[in-house]
């Protein structure tokens, strides 16, 4: 009796087995993987601008303080700052202006390990510019901060309120008294 029940159950499950996916059979052959080529150290093969390679000299690596994003470039003009803020706004990030009166760069005064008091946290200028749609509004706030604190470092940061992270940060103004050393 038990054998007849077992065979009828096997008959019922056989149509379901016909629709199952084939089992995993292992990795594909190595013929499907690309063959590695000999490394070509010729710099002209890397650039594809018609054979003309134009390299831009970057900021000197020794004796210059590094700040935020783009710190290896010369100071940004008002037009370039506006373009960076437009990029920030296009990505739906919330702009915020911050300033620092003493040290506009990371420094370690109270130890050799990174910590809270090593120059990463600046004072916020007003509130973040929620709902801002124009880079001129942000640059106006930078100008007001410059007027109020002419000897301060000023940076613009962008927050992504969905991911709850700071996505961009760059220096908008360095005080005239700063020598860069």
UniProtKB/Swiss-Prot annotation:
Residues 1-54 form a transit peptide. One of its GO terms (cellular component) is chloroplast. GO terms for molecular function: ribulose-bisphosphate carboxylase activity. Heterohexadecamer of 8 large and 8 small subunits. The gene is RBCS2. GO terms for biological process: photorespiration; reductive pentose-phosphate cycle. It is found in: Plastid, Chloroplast. This is Ribulose bisphosphate carboxylase small subunit, chloroplastic 2.
């Amino acid at each position: 009796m038990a054998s007849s029940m077992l065979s009828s159950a096997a008959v019922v499950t056989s149509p379901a087995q016909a629709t199952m996916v084939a089992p995993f059979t292992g990795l594909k052959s190595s013929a499907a993987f690309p063959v590695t080529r000999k490394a070509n150290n010729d710099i002209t093969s890397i650039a594809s601008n018609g054979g003309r390679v134009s390299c831009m000299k970057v900021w000197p690596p020794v004796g210059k303080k590094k700040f935020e994003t783009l710190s290896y470039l010369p100071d940004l003009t008002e037009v370039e700052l506006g373009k960076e803020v437009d990029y920030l706004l296009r990505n739906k990030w919330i702009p915020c202006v911050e300033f620092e009166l003493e040290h506009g760069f990371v420094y370690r005064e109270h130890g050799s390990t990174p910590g809270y008091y090593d120059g990463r946290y600046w004072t916020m200028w007003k509130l973040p510019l929620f709902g801002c749609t124009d880079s001129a509004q942000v640059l106006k706030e930078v100008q007001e901060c410059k007027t109020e604190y002419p000897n301060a470092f000023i940076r613009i940061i962008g927050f992504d309120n969905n991911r709850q992270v700071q996505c961009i940060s760059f220096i908008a103004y360095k005080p005239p008294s700063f020598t860069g050393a």
